[in-house]
Amino acid sequence: MKKFLKILLILILIFIIFFLTNKLLMPKYMDSLVEGSMISQYYDEDKNHEVIFIGDCEVYANFSPMVIYEETGITSYVRGSSQQLLWQSYYILEETLKYEKPKVVVFNVNAMRYDKPVSEAYNRLTLDKMKWSKQKYEMIKASMTEEE
């Protein structure tokens, strides 16, 4: 019985150390910023949207699926994140079309003015929130800078 309690105590201690280390090493923007959360929240949504909005902060700051639904009855979802680059939007669209076939996709081309990532933090807001998939892998390859 003592041996069992000792093993149990060691396992609990390992779990606590792992949990605390994970909290310490987790990028602070993962919990503190709303930007990018629509990327991850999408996976918990019903996949029957009539309209999908894809793009950078111009999209999530200016389109409200709740207001659109209340005023028109049209279901929609915003798959936007800060400084979402054009190629990131492409891969998000490709991934979205695996889950559902919306009637309309509003694709923001504002990001065409950027030809490289602005900052790693914004890059990661989009990348880190996606589920692992072929699209995420391709997006990571396309988003890497020369130093990475």
Q: Language-model features: where?
A:
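N-terminal hydrophobic targeting signals that begin at the initiator methionine
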Residues: M1-K2
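Serine-dependent acyl-ester chemistry module
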Residues: E148
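Hydrophobic membrane-insertion alpha-helices, especially the h-region
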Residues: K6-L24
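Membrane-embedded segments
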Residues: I54, E58-M144
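Short, surface-exposed loop/strand segments
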Residues: L11-F15, M30-S37, A61
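Acidic/glycine-enriched edge-of-secondary-structure segments
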Residues: T21-M30, T75-Q83
